[in-house]
């Protein structure tokens, strides 16, 4: 059975999000944050607070939805776990001034596991932006992409991050199952259990 790690929301906010926010700020400069609506909303929302520049507007957050393991209507058993399915995507026909052209786009997710969904997101967003550039003058400003993940699992990945895409992991971890507090129905109970598990782990280490 795979091991599981659990962290409190406060620890993730202070140790993993705030610690890397300064480096991301050098890149962002009023970027747009794109996140998975299920797994990336909490870290994206907290990061936006940390990256807020006094006197400026909030950084816009836009959502994309990708599913790898969820059984969805019109999907086959063979697709689950092997094929990335779009459940929500940007509507470039209605974005107007919110277009990604000429922007710095930070893609936010909880965990970089196999990198199937994250690699898909980067590739497809870059393709969409390239299509937009075909309709613009040759001197249109470039779009830059970067990625922030709360945890990067140290394991073999299904794809490589392009060299022109900056990558900001909050923490590097072994291939463990991560139990995030914002995915729990009772976040207070989750925090209590996470603290108990930490004390138990410390006790086990001391006995060794």
Language-model-detected regions and their locations in the chain:
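PRPP-dependent phosphoribosyltransferase catalytic core
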Residues: 8, 15, 123-208
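Gly/Ser/Thr-rich loops at beta-strand to alpha-helix junctions
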Residues: 34-42, 113-116
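Active-site-facing substrate-recognition patch
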Residues: 1-29
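Generic structural signal for small/hydrophobic residues in well-ordered secondary structure
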Residues: 47, 107-110, 180
